[in-house]
Amino acid sequence: INLLTDSLPAIALGVEPSDSEVMKDKPRAAKESILTGKFLSKIAVDGLVIGTMTMIAFLTGYRQNGALLGSTYAFGTLCLARLFHGFNCKSDRPVIFTKRFFNNKWLLGAFMLGAALITAVLTVPGLETVFKVETLNLAQLGTVYLCAFASLPIIQLLKWVRKE
């Protein structure tokens, strides 16, 4: 599951159409590392947002029915949030309300395949023993998707704030 849900979006981002706004950016200094403090802080903030949503999901599930449901919510949220995060990785600029959000058919396909696999793991009876999760009903699955999706607009908003 992890190989498909991480690898396919990464490959799809490799064929992302170029950003028409990129030439408006100042070039980085020739000796400047790609891994700048600013870039690493963006990674840390994105991770903090996704981690926070995963913890909220865990606590929600834990309060509903204990540790197994909590860990199932956390697993589903983290896997799906990483798929949603692929859209955050398209650009340094916010893309959520632009046509660029949907311009990479490979990323959309990778997202749909990954989401279908994760949904199957969380809802198909019999798979709970293989993946050590609790089978979710529709309302529970909705909670997982909501927690995972929430990271997307939050990170997009942070990108908008950084650019302003």
Predicted feature residues:
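C-terminal transmembrane helices and immediately adjacent loops/tails
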Residues: 1-164
